[in-house]
Amino acid sequence: MVHEVLQSHLAAIKNGSAPVNYEINSWQDLEQWFQAHLELQKRYKMTRGCPFGTVGNELTENDGLIRQDLGHLFEVVKHKLAMFFVREKAQGRLVKDANEEHLAAFCIATIQGAMLMGKIERDGQTVEIAFREALMHLKRYAVTPKS
């Protein structure tokens, strides 16, 4: 059953019907991506973390298929995020030494950690702070293109 649920979430992420927009085409889209995760958590009064992180936390050594599903799901999300950074770099709006894959992984790790802390504290403030700090960090890689 978990496999089918994860496959459904993966399909929604791929086709754009997920509750969170994973099509990031601007810094504003990235900010909205972070904010959408917080809004989802607030909808449940901060009693839940990321459903994917929750499933991942429950994995055992015998859950190979679920581990594979989650790995694929996170790779798809990471790829979508990385492609935003790739486009920014190609257009001269990201420093040349920025590693797009690392920035995308940082975004995912921030979401997972912040939502876990929000659930533990039952408060969105920590989540908001983490997201704001993450965006400030990421924007340090942004540059104005040379004319």
What does each of the following model-derived ranges do?
Residues 4, 65-76, 83:
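Short, solvent-exposed amphipathic helices
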Residues 46, 69, 83-95:
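A surface-exposed regulatory interaction patch that couples sensing to output
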Residues 32-40, 75-91, 105, 110, ...:
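C-terminal peripheral helix-coil segments that are non-catalytic and often amphipathic
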Residues 29, 44-65:
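Amphipathic alpha-helical segments used for helix-helix packing
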Residues 96, 100-104:
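Membrane-interface starts of transmembrane alpha-helices
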